[in-house]
Amino acid sequence: MRAHLLHCELAFSFGKYFYSTSFLNLLMINLMFSKLGAIFFLNLALYLLALALFFFFLFNVKVALLKSVSQIYYFNNIFFFKFFVLIFFLNLAGIPPLLGFFLKFLIFFFLFFKTNLAFILIFLGFNMATLFFYLSTVKSFVNRKQASVLNSFNFFIRAELSFLYFFNFFYFFLFFAFFFLDSTFLIFLNLFF
């Protein structure tokens, strides 16, 4: 039972990166302009596949036996673990040779012909913000001091979580409001919030 609870806590700490504002922004943009088209389903399917593969890997590595996040640096000796985590987070961030970049490029290309420059700049700004979070997570896996600092500053981690959850709630609101509101109004909301 204790191992299961620790595993759930670790999954919860990783959860903030999977449901990022960038991903919700991508879903909202896809729904607004493609009207539940093929790009939306491709994007959703590939993100869910990446998420499922990552959790499958975590279950098989028995990360549930860890007592805290700072002990994750013990896996630094396992090259495959570091490589897999690095590729996973870079894929979610949308770094060019990976599939996550291809999906973001499709959406960016579609936005280029459908909207104005301000909306594209907001989209790129959210992508840069999530890239910072993904790269700082990868750095904490490699750097032993930073991994131990994560346990020392739980208050700051919780503040960051609450900030991200607020934005996730806001984008879920916009995501579901699409079905009830005109898409022009949603673009107006996204430009000012």
Curated annotation (Swiss-Prot):
Catalysed reactions listed for this entry: a ubiquinone + NADH + 5 H(+)(in) = a ubiquinol + NAD(+) + 4 H(+)(out)
Give yes or no: UniProt keyword Ligase. Answer: no
Q: What class of enzyme is it?
A: translocase
Which keywords describe this protein according to UniProt? Electron transport, Membrane, Mitochondrion, Mitochondrion inner membrane, NAD, Respiratory chain, Translocase, Transmembrane, Transmembrane helix, Transport, Ubiquinone
Q: What is its EC number?
A: 7.1.1.2
Q: Which domain of life is it from?
A: Eukaryota
Q: Which GO terms describe its cellular component?
A: mitochondrial inner membrane
Which molecular function terms from Gene Ontology are attached?
NADH dehydrogenase (ubiquinone) activity
Compartments it resides in: Mitochondrion inner membrane
Q: Please list which residues make up the signal peptide.
A: none
Q: Could you tell me the membrane topology recorded for this protein?
A: Multi-pass membrane protein
Q: Does the keyword Cytoplasm apply?
A: no
Which residues span the membrane?
Answer: 18-38, 39-59, 83-103, 116-138, 161-181
Functional note:
Core subunit of the mitochondrial membrane respiratory chain NADH dehydrogenase (Complex I) that is believed to belong to the minimal assembly required for catalysis. Complex I functions in the transfer of electrons from NADH to the respiratory chain. The immediate electron acceptor for the enzyme is believed to be ubiquinone.
Q: What is this protein called?
A: NADH-ubiquinone oxidoreductase chain 2
Q: Which organism does this sequence originate in?
A: Paramecium tetraurelia
Starting at the broadest rank, the lineage of the source organism is:
Eukaryota, Sar, Alveolata, Ciliophora, Intramacronucleata
